């Protein structure tokens, strides 16, 4: 299967649009699983976005166009997709897992769903497995979409 993130901008944009269209009527659980699976396929770099420089983060379409993803950028793609589907009970957290590794996790529906950790594990990981170090300003992230 071809990784959409290895294709050109138009193909990535079309695939992301089709993902959102296909999930319009899905329940929150299904949306979380499919969105996580989609964004988990991005090729990762070590550092792209700084967690405390939200004002300079790309909007959703710039993110897809630039096609550079660290764990934070991958989580941001998930959040943008959730927001565009009308899901706004979302938190973006910097945390450490039970192995003391730093992670950027997306919590949905009052932390019922944990995204941006392991593929296919959206429903199987408890937020208790993490020590939340900082919650990023979700309103600033929402404003990025509002400004486009």
Report each predicted region and the residues it spans.
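A structural boundary/capping signal
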Residues: 1-148
């Amino acid at each position: 299967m071809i990784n959409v993130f290895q294709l050109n901008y138009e193909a990535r944009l079309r695939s992301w649009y089709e993902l959102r269209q296909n999930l319009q009527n899905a329940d929150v659980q299904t949306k979380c699983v499919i969105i996580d699976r989609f964004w988990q396929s991005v090729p990762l770099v070590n550092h792209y976005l700084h967690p405390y420089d939200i004002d300079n983060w790309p909007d959703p379409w710039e993110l897809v166009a630039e096609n550079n993803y660290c764990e934070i950028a991958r989580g941001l793609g998930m959040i943008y997709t959730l927001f565009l589907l009308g899901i706004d009970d979302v938190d973006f957290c910097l945390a450490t897992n039970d192995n003391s590794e730093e992670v950027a996790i997306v919590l949905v529906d009052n932390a019922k769903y944990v995204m941006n950790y392991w593929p296919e594990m959206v429903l199987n990981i408890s937020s208790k497995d993490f020590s939340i170090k900082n919650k990023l300003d979700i309103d600033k992230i929402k404003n990025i979409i509002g400004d486009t």
